């Protein structure tokens, strides 16, 4: 593995050397690449927030302390440094630096919160003249996460004590101000993750020893105004996030660290931390259905199953090579059948977490469906699902959902009873004292290849009787979904005929029981035909009448010759969430170059159009040579070669026509009709990019982002193993890149061998690859035509990209992660190792991140282009992590299962609902490998899959053009799925989507501004003149169409389906309001002949 890391770092250094040569020519804002390298957490922290030299001290402390302890110690050391004359301003600066550095350590030196989430730290006075510490939080503190935000408040208290300050002593009005802000934030801005009671806010506001304050983040004003120590009358969103989603919500963790550090004044948190006591006799855990995920039903995104409803997804434990980190497996036949699930589509789920990404796994159970002709079939492959989809009348069972043990561990959710499956059955036999040691069934081979083992009904009963194990899952039906009475009715019906090759029965209402049990059968000539194996299993299991009982399976086991297990004791409810995505990153409108042209380029910001006007006046920054006083837009003076100094930006007249002509000549590009610039620069220095770069981007049809990098966004999906065939790369090329052996230790010779993915290798989407080919051509043109260097990439096809380096970056972070392209996928996603995603502080529950060619970022990125507003440094590669250390990344990846099978004890104990930590001793996961060579290799999977991109590549939601078609497909699907109540879906769409949307749009229409079509100026009210100052026409910013867009479809749904009368009346009242808004309410005089 060290050879792999060293090779990555050698190639990175090679790219840096090219970038250094290019930047040294002085044609950019800086003469050196502006993305520093960082090998570990300590270097990332120093590169992100400083101070200089802190990396060495962090590494010293890391040896014998946890990350949190290091953060507190570093904070105290920085803050308590000697200050001349105890200067308050210098002490404030040290306290500010201490808090930022400590927060950066807590967040792995990745997220932007230490830079953007803390506005400033001040030392202020209480009303008794004692001094205290105040932390000004800003909105981006959210990116730190609740725990880090909470600990930043605790660290501030630690700093307060280290520098000898008193505690914050709020007065009543200040406390009540917090209470009002929380209520206003939730009613006017957005919901908090945790909604505290007013008394909880009062307690926190009065007891926290430092002032948790902040900048105004919203225009909403409070009634507790003009407070002496609060500088704003607006809502302080950052402060509320730190207090509510931080300190209050994460109270147990804050209290834990406060006790460890022996910090006084935090005991009040125990009121938030005490777990409810169990009453006497409350030994058994009862897990109720959780309906939270269906509280908001969105139009066009179907509900696939109501909470714990029969026929929903069945829980199956295990991790496939493409699941984990919140991605969960579904059979590709289910995906093909539903069409709304593609590879990477998000699902909102009942448990164990809130959401996941769907990926295909074909070694689990697929759906059971009833066709229009009455047949009931199990669908076992995507091709069959595609063929019969139009014939499906009802989806009786959605199939399995493969959920890793780590998902329960991460969410601290009790284990749910496991579904009876083949891998459990095999382990049960192998552990049976009656099973011979010579393994007559060759189960040691099939224990990880159970899908290859075919067992007849006769053999299944013989094995069960001989080795005293439950009946094979193939012949165990969904008995728990029917009553004892229904099974007795079924038994009587079965006994009306004799089993020969098949069992042929008269068509009777009892057929519905067969359907619910999931027994495959055909309908032929008004007769029901059951295959020999299924008929044999039913008749033998139901050989005697069942005694009345509330537990059907228990009653069945009293009469069955072999033990019957519950096939699906846990059903998981779901609904479709966010669609998958793979798309180039574009600003709106999308520029080719960060060069300001004001309004001269029209609405398209077209530079050639602006150049036709000759000279233009724009606000721009320029550099001046201190030697010869020549003004330019370069870091080295084009006249004398001296370093230039960037001056203050201001309004300047520039000859754009001449600049454009010279730039085109410099890069030997003939006239282009469209090169898009920007209206104005939003950076502090307002220093523009060279026009040559925009010309070359336009030539190659690529677009720049706010920091001058070119990016492509994709949904994140995990991958620990792959085959050469599914990533479209030859065996020979993979061997060149270091993949010489498969995951079982055999020499790599075949396209279908399974290889273990290296931790910084990525599989990008084909769309991403095609875009990066164009980016590579742009970079080569830039090197050759602008910097006068040799071309580097020389790519013609996407296959030529294999082996090249990329930088991965998540939107809320400021540290990019080094990666290497290893292949391509047809899915709309970027597959990477769980460590890679965790290094960006992301998981795979539909998060999407960007990739950029590393050389493009090194050549073009500059901090000078970043917005000067709050949050401007988020989503920018301020530092590049070159090596992933599993111990220094987000700990969610530490929960990844690494076993080739789920231990038998997990299956057996799952029926007792234990906490995941209670069975952790039999689990092998990443956490147990940290600090060992095994943390990088040998991370096995329990379930294989044929292809990681099997099934639909694009979900139906994205394919259907109109909301009406989306909703009709949503309702049609609801009618077919047994686990869904169609009426509830219709009411849910109306209540949580359409009606609130229309009401909000009516409100927006009545409050809207007007906009000038010529200069884009906006007015709160129409000017008395009726036109803009520039003479342009004024138009509304909210159209009538946006107000009424859901009205007709709402009325149609209400008329077609029997919904609640109250909802019907709400629609009628809303329609009356809309008509009143757009039509005159005056009664019109009519002639008498209207009534004749």
Swiss-Prot record:
InterPro entries tied to this protein: PolC_DP2 (IPR004475), PolC_DP2_cat_dom (IPR056172), PolC_DP2_central_dom (IPR056171), PolC_DP2_N (IPR016033), Znf-DPOE (IPR054475)
Highest taxon of the lineage: Archaea
Keywords of this entry: DNA replication, DNA-binding, DNA-directed DNA polymerase, Exonuclease, Hydrolase, Multifunctional enzyme, Nuclease, Nucleotidyltransferase, Transferase
Pfam families in the record: PolC_DP2_cat, PolC_DP2_central, PolC_DP2_N, zf-DPOE
Catalytic activity, reaction form: DNA(n) + a 2'-deoxyribonucleoside 5'-triphosphate = DNA(n+1) + diphosphate; Exonucleolytic cleavage in the 3'- to 5'-direction to yield nucleoside 5'-phosphates
Disulphide connectivity of cysteines: none
Biological process according to GO: DNA catabolic process; DNA-templated DNA replication
EC number(s) reported in the record: 2.7.7.7, 3.1.11.1
Function recorded in the entry: Possesses two activities: a DNA synthesis (polymerase) and an exonucleolytic activity that degrades single-stranded DNA in the 3'- to 5'-direction. Has a template-primer preference which is characteristic of a replicative DNA polymerase.
Subunit structure: Heterodimer of a large subunit and a small subunit.
HAMAP family: DNApol_II_L_arch
NCBIfam families the UniProt entry points to: polC (TIGR00354), PRK04023.1 (NF003103)
Designated name of the protein: DNA polymerase II large subunit
């Amino acid at each position: 593995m060290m050879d792999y890391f060293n090779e990555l770092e050698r190639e990175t250094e090679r790219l840096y050397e090219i970038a250094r040569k290019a930047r040294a020519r002085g044609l950019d804002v800086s003469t050196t690449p502006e993305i520093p390298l960082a090998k570990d957490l300590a270097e990332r922290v120093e590169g992100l927030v400083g101070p200089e030299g802190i990396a060495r001290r962090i590494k010293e402390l890391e040896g014998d302390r946890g990350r949190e302890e290091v953060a507190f110690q570093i904070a105290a050391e920085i803050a308590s440094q000697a200050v001349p004359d105890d200067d308050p301003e210098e002490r404030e600066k040290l306290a500010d630096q201490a808090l930022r550095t400590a927060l950066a350590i807590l967040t792995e030196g990745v997220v932007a919160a230490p830079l953007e989430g803390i506005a400033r730290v001040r030392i202020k006075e209480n009303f008794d003249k004692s001094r205290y510490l105040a932390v000004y939080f800003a909105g981006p503190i959210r990116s730190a996460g609740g725990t880090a935000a909470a600990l930043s408040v605790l660290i501030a208290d630690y700093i307060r004590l280290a520098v000898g300050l008193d505690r914050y002593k709020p007065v009543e009005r200040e406390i009540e101000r917090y209470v009002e802000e929380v209520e206003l934030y939730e009613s006017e801005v957005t919901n908090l993750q945790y909604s505290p009671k007013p008394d909880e806010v009062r307690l926190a506001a009065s007891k926290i020893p430092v002032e948790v304050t902040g900048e105004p983040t919203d225009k909403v004003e409070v009634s507790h105004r003009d407070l002496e120590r609060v500088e704003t009358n607006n809502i302080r969103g950052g402060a509320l996030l730190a207090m509510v989603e931080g300190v209050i919500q994460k109270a147990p963790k804050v209290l834990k660290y406060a006790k460890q550090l022996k910090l006084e004044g935090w005991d009040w948190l125990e009121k938030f931390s005490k777990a409810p006591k169990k009453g006497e006799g409350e030994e058994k855990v009862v897990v109720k259905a959780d309906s939270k995920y269906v509280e908001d039903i969105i139009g066009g995104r179907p509900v696939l199953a109501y909470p714990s409803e029969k026929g929903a997804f069945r829980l199956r434990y295990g991790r496939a090579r493409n699941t984990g980190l919140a991605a969960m497996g579904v059979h590709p036949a289910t995906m093909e059948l539903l069409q709304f699930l593609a590879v990477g589509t998000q699902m909102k789920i009942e448990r164990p977490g809130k959401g996941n990404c769907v990926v295909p796994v074909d070694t689990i159970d697929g759906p059971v469906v009833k066709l229009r002709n009455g047949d009931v079939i199990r669908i076992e492959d995507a091709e069959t699902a595609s063929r019969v989809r139009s014939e499906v009348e009802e989806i009786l069972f959605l199939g399995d959902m493969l959920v890793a043990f780590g998902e329960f561990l991460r969410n601290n959710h009790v284990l749910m009873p496991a579904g009876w499956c083949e891998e459990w059955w095999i382990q049960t036999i192998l552990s049976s004292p009656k099973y011979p040691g010579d393994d007559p069934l060759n189960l040691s081979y099939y224990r990880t290849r159970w899908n290859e083992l075919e067992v007849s009904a006769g053999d299944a009963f013989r094995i069960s009787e001989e080795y005293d194990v439950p009946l094979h899952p193939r012949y165990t039906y969904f008995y728990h979904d029917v009553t004892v009475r229904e099974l007795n009715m079924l038994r009587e019906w079965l006994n009306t005929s004799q089993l020969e090759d098949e069992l042929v029965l008269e068509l009777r209402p009892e057929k519905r029981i067969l359907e619910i049990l999931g027994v495959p059968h055909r309908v032929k000539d008004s007769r029901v035909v059951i295959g020999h194996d299924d008929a044999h299993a039913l008749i033998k299991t139901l050989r005697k009448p069942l005694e009345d009982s509330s537990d059907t399976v228990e009653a069945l086991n009293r009469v069955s010759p072999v033990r019957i297990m519950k096939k699906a004791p846990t059903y998981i409810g779901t609904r479709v969430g966010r669609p998958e995505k793979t798309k180039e990153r574009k600003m709106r409108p999308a520029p080719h170059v960060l060069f300001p042209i004001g309004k001269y380029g029209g609405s398209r910001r077209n530079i050639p159009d602006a150049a036709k006007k000759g000279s233009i006046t724009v606000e721009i920054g320029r550099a001046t040579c201190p030697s010869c006083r020549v003004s330019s837009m370069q870091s080295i003076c084009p006249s004398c070669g001296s370093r230039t100094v960037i001056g203050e930006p201001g309004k300047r007249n520039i000859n754009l026509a001449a600049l454009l002509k010279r730039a085109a000549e410099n890069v030997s590009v003939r006239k282009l009709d469209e090169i898009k610039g920007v209206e104005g620069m939003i950076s502090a220095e307002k220093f523009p990019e060279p026009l040559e770069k925009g010309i070359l981007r336009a030539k190659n049809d690529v677009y720049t982002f706010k920091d001058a990098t070119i990016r492509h966004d994709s949904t994140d999906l995990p991958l620990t193993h792959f085959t050469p065939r599914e990533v479209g790369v030859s065996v020979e090329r993979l061997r060149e890149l270091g993949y010489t052996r498969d995951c079982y230790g055999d020499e790599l010779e075949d396209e279908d061998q399974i290889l273990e993915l290296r931790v910084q290798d990525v599989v990008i989407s084909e769309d991403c690859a095609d875009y990066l080919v164009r980016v590579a051509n742009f970079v080569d043109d830039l090197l050759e035509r602008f910097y006068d260097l040799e071309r580097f990439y020389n790519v013609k096809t996407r296959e030529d990209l294999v082996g090249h380096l990329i930088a991965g970056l998540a939107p809320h972070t400021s540290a990019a992660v080094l990666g290497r392209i290893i292949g391509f996928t047809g899915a709309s996603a970027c597959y990477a190792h769980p460590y890679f995603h965790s290094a960006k502080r992301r998981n795979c529950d539909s998060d999407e991140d960007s990739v950029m060619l590393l050389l493009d970022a090194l050549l073009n990125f500059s901090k000078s282009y970043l917005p000067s507003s709050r949050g401007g440094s988020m989503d920018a590669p301020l530092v590049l992590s070159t090596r992933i250390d599993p111990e220094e990344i987000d700990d969610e990846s530490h929960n990844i299962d690494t076993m080739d099978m789920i231990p038998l004890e997990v299956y057996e104990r799952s029926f007792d609902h234990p906490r995941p930590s209670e069975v952790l001793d039999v689990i092998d996961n990443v956490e147990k490998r940290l600090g060992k060579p095994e943390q990088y290799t040998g991370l096995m999977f329990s379930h294989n899959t044929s292809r990681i991109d099997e099934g639909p590549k694009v979900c139906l939601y994205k394919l259907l053009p109109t909301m009406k078609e989306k909703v009709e497909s949503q309702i049609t699907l609801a009618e077919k799925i047994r686990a869904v109540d169609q009426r509830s879906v219709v009411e849910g769409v109306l209540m949580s989507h359409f009606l609130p949307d229309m009401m909000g749009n009516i409100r927006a229409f009545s409050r809207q501004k007007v906009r000038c079509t010529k200069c884009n100026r906006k007015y709160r009210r129409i000017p008395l003149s009726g036109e803009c100052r520039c003479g342009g026409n004024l138009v509304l910013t909210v159209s009538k169409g946006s107000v009424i867009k859901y009205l007709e479809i709402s009325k149609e749904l209400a008329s077609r389906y029997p919904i609640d009368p109250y909802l019907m009346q709400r629609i009628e009242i809303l329609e009356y309001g809309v008509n009143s808004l757009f039509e005159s309410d005056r009664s019109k005089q009519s002639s008498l002949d209207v009534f004749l």
